[in-house]
Amino acid sequence: DTDRSRGLGDVYKRQLLYSKDINAIYHDNIGLYRTEQFVNDGGAGNARPYYNGYYSDREGNQKAANHVVMLRNTSKGHSLYTTFQLQKNFVDGILKGLYLNGSYSFGQSRGVTDGTSSVATSAWKYRAALDGNAEEVGYTAGSFDGRLLLSASYTANWSKYAATSFGLIYQRYRPFRYSYCYNGDANGDSQFSNDLMYIPANFDEVKDHLLPGDFDSQEDAWKAMNAFIEQDPYLSKHRGEYAERNGAVAPFANQLDLSVSHDIK
């Protein structure tokens, strides 16, 4: 942290925060049997392993237990954030009572698990991944690109018994991250909507897998899919790759709050 005061209520702050996971937790469902096969969905042939579901072993026999989730340790994770802040407090003159504050923070946080669930099975089920049992590093749910915060307050002292305060706060930020996943069970682990999707670069990569659905032909289905990819900033930038966990970011949100309070002593 660096704080510098220039006198007369001026303060400049600079902050750098770095953290590194040493013994963080990730979840391994040892009740699953991993086959020697891989899912061919247009991407790398060995990126997504295929599982034989919960309820059968190597020979296809029904197992007595499922959802056996083991908590393991991982050191794959870190975060880095920087904040710059300016403060001005008018202590005399015509603007006495006015306080101004402005800050900008940016950085990123990456880890194996978000830690948003208190139950081990839920933490395993709802983590978007190529392989739900692997130490895959992705953006954490709380990772943000940037946040601008501007605030101003003014207190008018009418007498020694009464004062009115006015406050204004403006924020510009990206409210959340999200993942692009298949609507189904792509890797046979008996969980739905947690398999990160492959973002096709062209029609040839998906023509063996793409079903027409409500469209008249594969070509028409591809035109609709391609148009969706093109209009999305994240998907269009990562063609030919697997989507990252929490890789996509919501558009900037703007929030303005106004407050007025009156104090009587």
What are these regions (language model features)?
Residues 1-12:
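Single conserved hydrophobic/aromatic residue that forms the stacking wall/gate
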Residues 13-265:
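Short, solvent-exposed micro-motifs at the edges of structured domains
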